[in-house]
Amino acid sequence: TNFGVLASPNATLEELHLLQKLARRLGIENLDCRLRQQDFSLDAAGILAPKLNHSLPEVESLSDVLLVGSYLRKELPMLNHRLRKAQLNSKHISVINPVEFDFNYRLTHSLIDNDLVQNLMGVVKAASELTGKNDQAWLKKSIKVSPEQAAVAKDLMAAKNGAIMLGQIAQVDTHYS
């Protein structure tokens, strides 16, 4: 018989890691925590799980971070702690979220709107205008760039080493991929 493990998407990364170690020790290879995910179209391209392309110490050295659809304080407390340390060292942290959360560090920019995709597209369009590479047809559509979106794009473009991180709220969005 085949067994599987379904883990809560509310579990922390640390809890999920320990659960998969236990499951594999018991010979269970079928694990999934994407219970709320609605868009699986990236699976065909081999993108099965989001990943952090930085070590935790490297996160502290990022000069600018944009969090999209995330409340790291609850999602990934250890990563949140590293970002807090970075912000205390004058690094910029901005967010695009559907609601305002109680972050334990000062945010440089806070774009609060239910439509994460529209807000992110505004930042992308502003960045493309800054680079002069505005040749994408979808960017020429009626995407209006707000001053706050332009400021986020300007900070990210000026950053020596910046990052955009997608959180759990973004991952359960119907337009995730």
Regions picked out by a protein language model, each given a short descriptive name:
Residues T1-S177:
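Catalytic alpha/large subunits of respiratory electron-transfer oxidoreductases
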